[in-house]
A protein has these predicted regions:
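Acetyl-CoA-dependent GNAT
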Residues: 4-10, 15-93, 99-112, 139-145, ...
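C-terminal "cap" of GNAT-fold acetyltransferases
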Residues: 80, 115-129, 133-165
């Protein structure tokens, strides 16, 4: 089941956020930064985020618990929507929940009038890049350098045309 996130989801969103980062980004970003991530600190961030959402945060559930989330909204580029984040708890990788969550995010962007969408992904994250490509996203031209956990990393942009409601 996919639904909009609610304030009561903050702790589960924090758990998914931390465990997915610590697993997916192992070897890709600063390990000390990953090791220092705590669910407690992320709960505070999610409490704040959910009270000031700049778009929509969708969650997917499995066995009555939040299994993943997708955050979407307007991009800085004119008319573009953006998938700000999509993460699944590692125990739910590879079973189709991510595909459904991404499709729901794309649909939400289309319903909000965005004709195309973008997302950013670490250039070294082969698993995520393959996932996006399987979902019809194509590599765009821009790259950017971001500082995550005290280390500079390269991100590439993926793009996809959207259909409306």
């Amino acid at each position: 089941m996919i639904r909009d996130a609610e304030p009561r989801d903050a702790a589960e969103l924090a758990r998914v956020h931390v465990t997915s980062w610590q697993t997916a980004y192992r070897g890709l970003i600063n390990q000390a930064f990953l090791d220092a991530m705590t669910i407690e600190s992320r709960i505070e961030r999610w409490d704040t985020l959910l009270s000031h959402v700049r778009g929509r945060v969708l969650v997917t559930e499995a066995d009555g618990k939040v299994a993943g989330f997708c955050s979407v909204g307007p991009a800085d580029a004119d008319g573009w929507g953006e998938v700000y984040a999509i993460y699944l708890a590692p125990e739910h990788w590879g079973v189709g929940l991510g595909r459904g969550l991404l499709e729901a995010g794309e649909k939400a962007l289309g319903e909000n009038g965005h004709g195309r969408a973008q997302l950013w992904v670490l250039s070294t994250n082969a698993r995520a890049r393959a996932f996006y490509q399987r979902q019809g996203w194509t590599l765009g031209r821009p790259i950017r350098i971001e500082n995550i956990g005290g280390s500079d990393v390269t991100e590439v942009r993926y793009e996809k045309p959207l259909t409306g409601p």
